[in-house]
């Protein structure tokens, strides 16, 4: 059968050139450098000069011919043109093509097709299309008859149609088509072409794959990446920061799409400190000497600030010149500064034993504006030089203060008379502590004038009779010379007519007095400068005429009282021993069960029952927790992880009830029976509680997997993280309201005789209305060791949250409602500090030691005094003296009703720089006299002052103020602070038996 004329292959002769016009050069969309897709060729017939020798079926179908391309290079092509015969099925198969691990292959076809209408006398079966197929194999296994020449096993890619066909008189028009197929999984593949009645030439076939070229973007390097199996696939390419760059967000990756183009960058790098961007974000160049860059980022290097330099590249900070420094609070871009020069023009004005110093500002402030002054006092001996001078005593007083002065004037008093002093006025600023040299100063030498002695501190009564008083006193603290004698003034209180007596000793006997009369006595010392001031009035009383008999009885009274007391103690001891023995015999077998049950019986009172007292713990679950059908539960998302598994948010829709959000705790796969029991014990505990400030149990799922506990959903999650997220956003009343809710929940638990053991802000949940609810029941005892989380520390076989736990619970595992009160005080501190970590970065052992030494947390910033006092009440060492939760609720209610009481703010500031408060509290009830108490706090020197001023009882001492201390002669600020602090503790002990007052 004669064939129609097929489209001729390209060849050099001019007559045939019109059949193969030059290929149309389509414009390419230029991609940025480094972002253009790469194409790797697997097979290209354009470069084959020998026979292709592809397999055709039947042999009368496709025919291999030679030709030339547009550059006159010889090429091998295939053509077919059996258009005059119907039902054509001509197949052509390439050789085996190795896949090279790519998943998707592209095929570029260049061909010409003759227009069927241009061929005369052909049947209607003439076509202008052909089909493209492929067949996968692990090796070159194809033969002339295998695989079968049909669509299955061959996989069809597409039917290829030309954009343009040509007629007999037209020049051949070359069509270019690109198709792709995948995913591929075997070692290689064959391409196959099916002709069903077309007149065409297959000029060239190219099989290739695409990949994204290696690129640099956003200071990160991304490697060459093969495209995915589908045209829409996005293949992740992990990136690495370029040299001298650091990650600023992770993960660092770029997506390679099916066209071999990069898109969707995730994460980023930026230039590290000491480096600046260069070459369009493809380099991070070191800062040259003389410049620096303190922060990572895309900013440029900056010239060094004044008085600083760099000697090497890539500097993140410029070092200061010699004798120039930066303070710790100065930023890296701050200029280096130096210490100030000495103050100028120091003027002294001496008045007896006091002094006023004034001076002018230094000539050079060192380039800073934080100038302060210190005044150093040195007392000099003899006529020697500076080596004969030593620091002044602590009783020298500086007003307004000695160190850190902002004023250029200071008043100095309580100096010794006739004494030579040297005063150094130092100028310091923020970098003085950085300098190895001492601060610069201006010195002035002065000599104090003659001065009278200071006041005699105290008077003591040695003995009294019906007509005499024997008295003694301590010398003045500042005699200001040699004491010549003492003058005593005394008078009967009812008459007021004074008499005087002189003594060269510091004691005297007053005779000729009336019996049973009260006398007022004062004494003063005299030197060559004259008399000093009289001491404060002291009152003493003579005895009556019957005093001798009474005195004898008084001498025997201790013996009588001691004997009676010893007898009473013996009787009580015998009775106690007998009672203890009887109780041990009667209740010995039941004590362990009773303590474990943690309940007491009261008419009409619901009590907590420990689920671990059940022989079968599952019985407790059935009794206290409602079983929920798993079909009613829908888990939406995982919101966290717990000790036993994941914590999820979900919905609960029970028949006849509206759908509600719930929190779902799940038990992880592979649990043991003990883990299941421990997990469900929380539900057994929670199911016994019904209070608006206790997390509500919705039910449990135990009849399917996973096992679940469902509770009400709290939108704002844990209180500590919620407060940190909203730092400073709430009023004090709102915070107190949160504390009141927590206290109300704990009051309910304590009334049910339940001890929480792990009360902390992390275990308080907050809903959308800021209602706080106590949660996490019973799980802390099962926590596993986690060295990375020091919150819980092993102690006596269990896990204890040291920072929140009372001392007796840490030492003896003695958990009670009183230990929960201690933990509640820590929660108060967490709330008022907006979620700060208690005791900051102190180790657990340091916390234990500090609490044992009676140190307590200071008030958080802007914390009302009343709230911090309530915290301190919760942290009293003796658990019996801590307030009950009912008292705490009443106190907070009063504070909320009386908002003005919350405006008194504690002066201490929260933070790492604030030391713990020393709360050493001597028990005043163990002291017989006020003097014993003063000795205990190492203030015994003031015993006579207290007694002579009339402060002889603890009730009176508890009412003393700072003015009272000044009046009785306690003038040193440190001593005043120590005594007042102990008085405050004394008041606390006196009030512990009563509800906390507001």
Curated annotation (Swiss-Prot):
Residues 34-559 are extracellular. GO terms for molecular function: ATP binding; axon guidance receptor activity; ephrin receptor activity; transmembrane-ephrin receptor activity. Residues 339-451, 452-545 form the Fibronectin type-III domain. Phosphorylated. Autophosphorylates upon ligand-binding. Autophosphorylation on Tyr-614 is required for interaction with SH2 domain-containing proteins. The modification Phosphotyrosine is found at residue 614. Heterotetramer upon binding of the ligand. The heterotetramer is composed of an ephrin dimer and a receptor dimer. Oligomerization is probably required to induce biological responses. It holds the Pfam family Ephrin_lbd. SUPFAM superfamilies: Fibronectin type III, Galactose-binding domain-like, Protein kinase-like (PK-like), SAM/Pointed domain. Disulfide bonds join 81-199. This is Ephrin type-B receptor 3. GO terms for cellular component: cytosol; dendrite; extracellular region; plasma membrane. GO terms for biological process: angiogenesis; axon guidance; axonal fasciculation; cell migration; central nervous system projection neuron axonogenesis; corpus callosum development; dendritic spine development; dendritic spine morphogenesis. The chain crosses the membrane at residues 560-580. Glycans are attached at residues 351, 445. Belongs to the protein kinase superfamily. Tyr protein kinase family. Ephrin receptor subfamily. Residues 581-998 are cytoplasmic. Its EC number is 2.7.10.1. It is a single-pass type I membrane protein. SMART domains: EPH_lbd (SM00615), Ephrin_rec_like (SM01411), FN3 (SM00060), SAM (SM00454), TyrKc (SM00219). Gene3D superfamilies: ephrin a2 ectodomain (2.60.40.1770), Galactose-binding domain-like (2.60.120.260), Immunoglobulins (2.60.40.10), Phosphorylase Kinase, domain 1 (3.30.200.20), Transcription Factor, Ets-1 (1.10.150.50), Transferase(Phosphotransferase) domain 1 (1.10.510.10), Tumor Necrosis Factor Receptor, subunit A, domain 2 (2.10.50.10). A motif (PDZ-binding) lies at residues 996-998. The lineage of its organism: Eukaryota, Metazoa, Chordata, Craniata, Vertebrata. Residues 633-896 form the Protein kinase domain.
